[in-house]
Structures are given as structure tokens and as C-alpha cells.
Amino acid sequence: MSTHLLEQLIDAFRILPGVGQKTAQRMAYHVLEREREGGQRLADVLSRAIEKIGHCTECRDFSETKICAICANYSRDRHQLCVVESPPDRLAIEQATGYRGLYFILQGRLSPLDGIGPHELGLDHLGQRLAAGEVTELIIATNATVEGETTAHYLALLARQHGIRPSRLAQGLPLGGELEYLDRGTLSHAFGTRTEVV
């Protein structure tokens, strides 16, 4: 019996974060032995998602439409713009706080050693949004890592260039911590006690 296809399936599972060889093997065998129908459903949904989910032209979040539901919602405060590194960070803030402004998702953080500069993060597009004059506060919600702090500093400079007050999430964020893994209470407190970036 050829195991070439089985090996490809195991390798395919390994693209997921935190999934090593052993876990990928368990997943592959589980799908083939006990969950073929679920595996087919997963394959179908994954295929459709890859085909149909793109990025919102306003905030760069994942969306099935040109403009996502948050950006299209005119009851949200268009004077506040919260910048986060990733869609899971946006989701964490949305679920844990009463924030009713808009977002901008960087899809990463500045990391010159990895070839990630302002262009890769869409900061030219962010600059255009800030220049439009609607935003009065830029809330910087990058992670408390070296790259996150570097990105926050760059964002604060960009905001000031456009006469916009930058603020940063405050207490409760552990150094080196990732927003998506914080509990709701900590994130809500940090969001509520954000400080102006100097």
C-alpha cells in the first residue's frame, strides 16, 4: 500500500501553528479512521474560505465582502481608530471591551530582520486614512514585544504627523505578551486605562 497520500495529509496538518509531527499523525489517522465525513466537511469549508475570504479594503481584516461589517457600520465611532497586529487581536478587543470605534489590522509588526517594513503592514494606507481628517484618536494596541513596541513608536510618529493624538493600551499587559491570549478582564482594564504615547 502506498503511503504517499497519507504522508502528504500529515504534512498538510503540520502547517497549523503548534502542530508537530506526532500531532499531525494523530489528526490524519483520526480523520481517516473515525471522522471521514467531518474531514470532508473541513476540506469543503476550508476550500470555500480560501477562495472567498479576502481582506477588507478599509481595515485589512478578513472579510467575505469588499468592506467588512465593522467598517460598514456607521453607528460606530469613526473618530477612534484602533490599530492591532492581527485579526485575533481585533476579536479579543471586540469581545472584551466596550470599544465602538473602527480598526486597522496590520497583519504583522515591524521586523526589518524579517523583511517586514511599513509597506508590508499597509502603513501607507493607514497614513491616507489619517490624512482624511476623520480620525482624532489613534489607539495603538500592538503586543508588548520588542517588535510590537517598535511598531507602536512608529505608529505614534505617524499619528502626530497628521495632528492626531496617539494613545497606547496601559496596565495589565505583560511584557512579551500577546493580546489574543489575555483574559477579558485584563484586556478590558488595559483598554480602559490606555495612555497617550509621548
Swiss-Prot record:
Annotated family: Belongs to the RecR family.
Name of the protein in its database record: Recombination protein RecR
UniProt function note: May play a role in DNA repair. It seems to be involved in an RecBC-independent recombinational process of DNA repair. It may act with RecF and RecO.
Gene Ontology MF: a single term: DNA binding
UniProt domain Toprim: residue ranges: 79-174
Gene3D superfamilies for the chain: 3.40.1360.10, 6.10.250.240, RecR Domain 1
Taxonomy of the source species: Bacteria, Pseudomonadati, Pseudomonadota, Gammaproteobacteria, Lysobacterales
Residue intervals of every C4-type zinc finger in the record: 56-71
